[in-house]
UniProtKB/Swiss-Prot annotation:
<dbReference type="GO" id="GO:0005634">
    <property type="term" value="C:nucleus"/>
</dbReference>
<feature type="binding site">
    <location>
        <position position="264"/>
    </location>
    <ligand>
        <name>S-adenosyl-L-methionine</name>
    </ligand>
</feature>
<feature type="binding site">
    <location>
        <position position="159"/>
    </location>
    <ligand>
        <name>S-adenosyl-L-methionine</name>
    </ligand>
</feature>
<feature type="binding site">
    <location>
        <position position="312"/>
    </location>
    <ligand>
        <name>S-adenosyl-L-methionine</name>
    </ligand>
</feature>
<dbReference type="InterPro" id="IPR016899">
    <property type="entry name" value="mRNA_G-N7_MeTrfase_euk"/>
</dbReference>
<keyword id="KW-0506">mRNA capping</keyword>
<feature type="site" description="mRNA cap binding">
    <location>
        <position position="211"/>
    </location>
</feature>
<feature type="binding site">
    <location>
        <position position="202"/>
    </location>
    <ligand>
        <name>S-adenosyl-L-methionine</name>
    </ligand>
</feature>
<keyword id="KW-0949">S-adenosyl-L-methionine</keyword>
<feature type="region of interest" description="Disordered">
    <location>
        <begin position="1"/>
        <end position="118"/>
    </location>
</feature>
<feature type="region of interest" description="Disordered">
    <location>
        <begin position="360"/>
        <end position="381"/>
    </location>
</feature>
<dbReference type="GO" id="GO:0004482">
    <property type="term" value="F:mRNA 5'-cap (guanine-N7-)-methyltransferase activity"/>
</dbReference>
<feature type="site" description="mRNA cap binding">
    <location>
        <position position="311"/>
    </location>
</feature>
<dbReference type="GO" id="GO:0003723">
    <property type="term" value="F:RNA binding"/>
</dbReference>
<keyword id="KW-0539">Nucleus</keyword>
<dbReference type="InterPro" id="IPR004971">
    <property type="entry name" value="mRNA_G-N7_MeTrfase_dom"/>
</dbReference>
<feature type="site" description="mRNA cap binding">
    <location>
        <position position="426"/>
    </location>
</feature>
Length: 502
């Protein structure tokens, strides 16, 4: 589920939502500078580097510099080596034993680190190979032949809702509603054309590019990172199609500058990605960083997005903390971390319920006669599985009797989604443990809701409501949600969230 393809978000609106949608679009346009928008500074950087390289390659008409005078020969190298004799003889047995123990400790530490790295790469490689192998399907197929077209459209609308609600900064939101809550009277005037810097962790095939193009506050730079190399190639092709007019660009100004790179965003530090390094990433984010860095430091990005991906980070505490170091390190103060992931409340309730049923069967000694309920498959005592014809969740190992996952890391299950995910390992993200962990990285929870509650709250919004009709989520005439009951059950497995960097 790391990559959902967009529906026709930029298509013409209609029906009862057209006038309100147009008014909001006009309001957003009034907040932007009129006239030609200058290109992104990051796009100009590429052009400047090309020009500088060209200038460096031009032939010069200057006279050659005179040769430097010859230097006196250096003394013989052997003469420079001075070693006090007898040093080794004075090393006592205790010192030799100490050195031997230290060497053994270093070797043991290196072996343990190599083992952890190998284990981490094992799951990462499985996920990467899976998404590299997912076929690229066209929009027409998704709209007509897909078995989960309602779920695809709904998931895309949820992500669009997050971007619409939480990607703008406080200054932009305050100006859009005509207040000055963003500053006191002594503050300088606002930047009329301030644009967002966004990094997308697990960008997949670039399915959210169109959503960012339609963000209320314009995007200046989009950085897409994903461990799957094939997905990065396809994301770059999708973006190039938008640049040349072959892809959906909507009607909201010029296309932002975008850069893509293959990267394990949870197992590795992002500071070695050139564009991330250029925008700014704080290497001291989180526990262990300096007091001044935690108070005043930060990265250069306004938004970090992670759609359907953070569950891969909960393989271990080390990976979860590396993920949060990357998120907090990239964000400036006031920046937003938004995304979607499996809802641990749903998982915990299912696990507790099925463990209780298993215990009842054991007590009654009628396990052979018991019939599984709809959507449940029971092959042995330890395996817990549920789902329907389009999705399936399966725990092969032991699970907590009460459904409370302690410790919060390493609870692996396999997940299947028709046409999207083929039985790959994922990990439970126990929400309260995750929220507590984010506090170590100066991230404060602002929003968290299950997918179906997001729909209930936002379906009548003056902009998001008409957007749901344009995206094929709701029937224009009846207002009905265009998903089957099985698709609704699959959607209920997820929730959306947003944190602020404080």
């Amino acid at each position: 589920m790391a990559d959902e393809n967009p529906q026709a978000q930029g298509a013409e609106g209609g029906g009862k939502g057209k006038s309100s949608s147009m008014r909001l679009q006009e309001r957003h346009q009034q907040l932007r500078k009129r006239g030609r928008t200058p290109p992104s500074a990051y796009a100009r950087r590429d052009m400047n580097e090309t020009a500088q390289q060209h200038n460096r390659n031009e032939s010069s008409n200057r006279s050659p510099s005179p040769l430097a005078p010859p230097r006196s020969p250096s003394p013989d190298a052997q003469a420079r080596k001075r070693k006090r004799p007898g040093g080794g003889a004075r090393m006592g047995l205790v010192d030799r034993e100490t050195l031997r123990r230290r060497q053994e400790e270093r070797e043991r530490s290196q072996q343990e680190e190599a083992m952890r790295f190998s284990q981490n790469r094992g799951v990462t490689d499985i996920v990467r190979h899976h998404y590299n192998a997912v076929p690229q399907r066209g929009r027409e197929w998704r709209k007509t032949e897909s078995k989960i077209k309602g779920l695809r459209s709904f998931n895309n609308w949820i992500k669009s809702t997050l971007i619409q609600k939480f990607s703008p900064d406080e200054e932009f939101v305050a100006r859009s509603i005509g207040t000055k809550d963003w500053a006191d009277e002594t503050a300088p005037p606002p930047m009329e054309d301030k644009r967002l810097l966004v990094v997308d962790l697990g960008c997949g095939k670039g399915g959210d590019l169109g959503k960012w193009q339609l963000a209320p506050q314009p995007v200046d730079l989009y950085v897409g990172l994903d461990p799957a190399e094939v997905s990065i190639v396809q994301a770059r092709e999708r973006y190039n199609g938008m640049r040349t007019g072959r892809g959906p660009r909507g009607r909201r100004g010029p296309l932002f500058h975008a850069e893509f790179a293959p990267k394990d965003c949870f197992g590795e530090y992002l500071g070695d990605v050139p564009i991330v390094q250029q925008v700014g990433i704080d290497p001291n984010a989180g526990p262990g960083g300096s007091v001044m860095s935690s108070r005043w430091g930060g990265g250069g990005f306004d938004v970090v997005a992670s759609m359907f991906t953070i569950h891969y980070a909960f393989e271990s505490e080390e990976k979860a903390r590396q993920m949060l170091r990357n998120v907090a390190g990239c964000l400036k103060k006031g920046g937003r971390f938004l995304g979607v992931c499996p809802n641990s409340d749903i998982i915990s309730a299912r696990v507790a319920e099925m463990n209780a049923k298993r215990k009842e069967r054991e007590t009654a000694a009628k396990k052979e006669e018991a019939e599984p309920e709809d959507g449940e498959v029971e092959e042995d005592d330890n395996k817990i599985e549920w789902g329907n014809s389009i999705y399936r969740v399966r725990f092969s190992g032991d699970t907590p009797e009460d459904g409370i996952f302690r410790p919060p890391f390493g609870w692996k299950y396999s997940y299947f989604m028709e046409e999207a995910v083929e039985e790959i390992p994922e990990y439970v993200v126990p929400w309260e443990a995750f929220r507590a962990l984010t506090e170590d990285y100066n991230l404060e929870l602002q929003y968290r809701k299950p997918f179906l509650e997001v729909w209930k709250d936002e379906k009548d919004d003056q902009e998001l409501g008409p957007l749901s009709e344009r995206m094929g989520v709701r029937d224009r005439n009846t207002g009905a949600l265009l998903m089957t009951e099985e698709e609704k059950e699959a959607a209920s497995f997820y929730h959306a969230f947003c944190f602020y960097k404080v």
